[in-house]
Amino acid sequence: MEVGLNEFLDMKKRYEDFKMKNKREPRYVTTKNGYKVMLPVFKDMLRRYEDFVRINGREPNYISIQPQPNGKIEIKKFRDMLRRYEDFVRINGREPNIIYLEQGKSDHVSLGTFKDMLRRYKDFVRINGREPNYISIQPQPSLKGHWTTKVIEKIGTFHDATSLYERVKKTCKYKYYYNDQVPNHVAVMRMTTSGINCTDACQLFSKVLEEMGYEVKIEHVRVKCNDGKWYGHYLLRVGGFELKDGTIWDYVSATKTGRPLGVPCCTAGFQHLGWGIVGPVYDK
């Protein structure tokens, strides 16, 4: 699959505009037909575009999209990738553009992806004193953020938005009160004891999920429950890594009504009201 030069330049402009506006990189860049090019793949396209211009003194007519494989690599295969990478650098005096997953096979990763795998491999060895059993090809959610660390200390470890939801379901409590009333550091203390409401939960867990690398929005809704009444409610819409864009992540579903990830706390009726919290907001 490939895109023409004009389309690529438009993607590049939108990527740069997003970075300037949001002070971070987007999770993906879309083509004109809606295909999502994930950030590592787009950055590899950008590198190849810049290499072509530098070498040829002109822009290419098109840039190919080379989706990288996903999944996990056993440690034995990763060691072989590392050996081939080091051999290439020693022989050629430079790094390779791509590294094949297995010698003689076509599946490969870009240099940037491989170096991220290598970084995560070294981090694991440093922290655990041993090699991992496997290395994930694509970057995994980060667990190093301030609020992520605080939540892990309180409820135990998790590795993505799905396992976080399950930990919340097992360890946290819901308590009804109006709107947001406590800052995030208090919410962390109360979520496993007296409990917190949907608003304070959204403020806290939106921070956690954003630190992990997900796209997160707080949604203001009305839900109709089994008693036939409508209630104002806040939940999260989350996308990235293992979750499809816009997946419902509802603290009250996890802690009170016991529904699975992706389902709102009440299912008899659902109305979208807006985005963000209406009223005072702590910990902006």
Curated annotation (Swiss-Prot):
Stated role: Cysteine protease that cleaves the cell wall of its host methanogen under hydrogen limitation of the latter (autolysis). Cleaves the epsilon-Ala-Lys isopeptide bond in the oligopeptides of pseudomurein.
Region (Pseudomurein-binding repeat): 4-31, 34-65, 70-100, 106-137
UniProt keyword terms in alphabetical order: Antimicrobial, Bacteriolytic enzyme, Cytolysis, Host cell lysis by virus, Hydrolase, Protease, Viral release from host cell
Cofactor: Ca(2+); Mg(2+)
Matches recorded under Pfam families: Peptidase_C71, PMBR
Cofactor binding notes: Need a divalent cation like Activated by Ca(2+)>Mn(2+)>Mg(2+).
EC identifiers of the protein: 3.4.22.-
Protein name listed in UniProt: Pseudomurein endoisopeptidase PeiW
Subunit structure: Monomer.
InterPro entries, sorted: Peptidase_C71, Pseudomurein-binding_repeat
A GO MF label: peptidase activity
Active site per database record: 198, 233, 250
Temperature dependence: Optimum temperature is 63 degrees Celsius.
